[in-house]
Amino acid sequence: MLKLTKKADYGLIALKHLAMRPPTGESEWGSASAKEIADTYGVPLPLLSKILQKLARAGFLRSEHGTNGGYRLARDPRLITALEVIRAIDGPIILTACFTEHGGHDCHHSEKCIVREPLRKVHEGILRLLSNITISDIASEEGLAEPDAHARASARLYGLELTAGLR
């Protein structure tokens, strides 16, 4: 089964929350504490704190200390893709052992494999879909593009359902 890890899901939720915050001071985006985000969405605070720290280290967030501290976006949400966020939290997205994220393969059966090429197409379709969804799209929910026909067809071949929304 293909699904986002809870960490990636929580990271996307936090970035959406921050993208929707009204601007404060000199910043285009408002800030929120880890506790506020955790309480709003029922996410465990210790886990969310680790995710937010990871997103800050990856350059997606700025951490601000003090009484009005918290996290705010460090980059324009129109330029942050779901794929970048998922990679920052979970590492490379690898559908099967047939190949790595960058096209190599790590399977002893690849010479005789009859599903390698269709799986490669599904893998590429998923990466393409995730790279075309931005935090701004997720925040607006109107801008989510439909998966391209090739990605949908490849996914159907394996009984997967690709939808643009992250529900």
Label the model's feature ranges:
Residues 46:
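Key DNA-contact positions within bacterial/archaeal DNA-binding proteins
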Residues 52-53:
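Short, hydrophobic-biased segments on the C-terminal half of alpha helices
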Residues 39, 56-57:
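Alpha-helical residues within the helix-turn-helix
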Residues 2, 6, 12-43:
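N-terminal helix-turn-helix DNA-binding core of bacterial DNA-binding proteins
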Residues 77-102, 115-124:
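Conserved segment of winged-helix/HTH DNA-binding domains
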Residues 100-167:
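C-terminal regulatory/oligomerization modules of transcriptional regulators
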Residues 59-74:
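Beta-hairpin "wing" of winged helix-turn-helix
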